[in-house]
Swiss-Prot record:
PANTHER family documented for this protein: PORPHOBILINOGEN DEAMINASE (PTHR11557:SF0)
Note, other: The porphobilinogen subunits are added to the dipyrromethane group.
Cofactor note: Binds 1 dipyrromethane group covalently.
Protein name (database record): Porphobilinogen deaminase
Keyword NADP attributed: no
InterPro entries: HemC, Porphobilin_deaminase_cofac_BS, Porphobilin_deaminase_N, Porphobilinogen_deaminase_C, Porphobilinogen_deaminase_C_sf
Amino acid sequence: MIRIGTRGSLLATTQAGTVRDALIAAGHDAELVIVSTEGDQRADAPIAEIGVGVFTAALREAIADGLVDAAVHSYKDLPTAPDPRFMIAATPVREDARDALVARDGLVLGELPAGSVIGTSSPRRAAQLRALGLGLEIRPLRGNLDTRLNRVSSGELDAIVVARAGLARIGRLDAVTEALEPVQMLPAPAQGALAVECRAGDTALAQVLSQLDDADTRAAITAERTLLAELEAGCSAPVGAIAEVVESIDEDGRVFEELSLRGCVATLDGSDVIRATGIGTPDRARELGLSVAEELFELGARDLLDEGGRDR
């Protein structure tokens, strides 16, 4: 029996459930084990205040202590600094990485009047919303997805911005009034992706879990998180990134794969946003992340991050 550790929220158990079901379909016995994390216990505190790894540390300790065999994380919650005790055995196919607007009266972002109150506790989302210059008021937002959605339906907020992937996984895409394109708002690095982690030395389990791995997703996540790590920015920093594997055709008509990466760094107040893009190949995803990070540095990203503080 493969014991899979997960947080207890509906979203977390649904995500982990997809991994459990895939393992069962492949002929392996698997079950979910609920693990309480500090992020769940301190649901009202801003994530940036609690610290890096707030949703993942307890799951990792459960693996280390032998309480579970593996854990399923929202990949974007994992600290960028590697922990030698563990390995990412699988990165399953990624959900749509875009952010989603859930607004009153079916409104899209451009239709919200100046002064509208939008909920988000993500510095990245808040900074990019402010940078659009729409005169929106940003309010802190924590709690599970149902709680967040209710703050719009109750009239407390005019809109919220959340990850589209989360709403898709719990079957609430009906609430989305607009999927925000990356040109409007770059997602968090690794948004919409899952990380299936196990003990570094558990090669037999890692081999089983690797059946769930998607090479294109792994390449994209590697590029995005390399950029994030190189910027020395934590998962709460105002940094956005999205990488995609795309097919191109060379001059001889042959199809080949490229990896594109877009990244941005913003000031917390949205007064300045620096953007950079790059093209590479999936097998050199890390190098692409490094090169786009270097371009961001050349454009002044270091000063912007120093202004907002860094946290690995």
